[in-house]
Amino acid sequence: MVLTTLRVGERAAPSVAPGGGQDNAAQSSRVSLQDALSLLTLPRFWALIFFVIGSCVYNVYDQQFPVYFVAQFPTKEEGTAMFGYLNSIQVFLEAAGLFCAPWLINRIGAKNGLIFAGMVMAVRMIGSGLVEGPVLIFITKLIHAAELPVLLVSMFKYITLNFDKRLSSTLYLVGFACTSSVIGTLISPLAGFGYDSIGFAPTYLIMGSVVFATTFTSIFLLRSGGDSSAEPAMSQVNVA
């Protein structure tokens, strides 16, 4: 329901031609393996992948954060209880953010939304490495509630604006979900090594710096708007 508020362009009425033109249009709009593979030839696809490589670090950050947070309290029981409160508050704020994010993205644009989410993510990680005490760490973790809704909504809208709309679900699964999982799997052992060797705070500083670097570079790589003329030829459906 939230994503339906995204106004990504005018909806075109289906073309109906004599002699079963509507069936021909449906046939032509089907996605083939060749259509999906053609994404690999698009520079803007790899630009999106580059951004995702940096943004998916937040999953690795969240994996061991409970251990770091609980360690800030005198007892494990007290720390675990406080983390439960933290997690509950964060979930409610994220839900509220999902209602506000489409309104924001429709005004600042999908690219700016992605950059904003990436920068907030970097600030959150770097802040977790700089601040001390459970209260400040509690606050830095809550920033995630402002970051995640903007990231998700911006990603959906960016994909819809800049790629063949027939491939939007494929792009989201491969370009965002799958890539995040694969990169997270590769980064997790490195993060674990950092936790054991130099500690949580220095590792968070490194992770935040990586996110900042990839997000800053993405300012020049991501496309500012949806240019339909730049879509691959396969997105053009001609009905005789």
Model-derived segments and their meaning:
Residues Q63-F83:
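Short amphipathic helix-loop junctions that connect adjacent transmembrane helices
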Residues L190-V211:
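A membrane-interface helix-boundary motif in multi-pass transporters
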Residues A96-A110, Y195-D196:
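Helix-to-loop junctions at the C-terminal end of transmembrane segments
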Residues N112-G127, L205-G208:
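Structural signature of the two symmetry-related core transmembrane helices
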Residues V8-I49, S235-A240:
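Juxtamembrane intracellular "pre-TM" segments in multi-pass secondary transporters
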Residues R166-S197:
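A late C-terminal transmembrane helix in Major Facilitator Superfamily
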Residues M1-V16, T215-R223:
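C-terminal membrane-cytosol helix-exit motif in multi-pass small-molecule transporters
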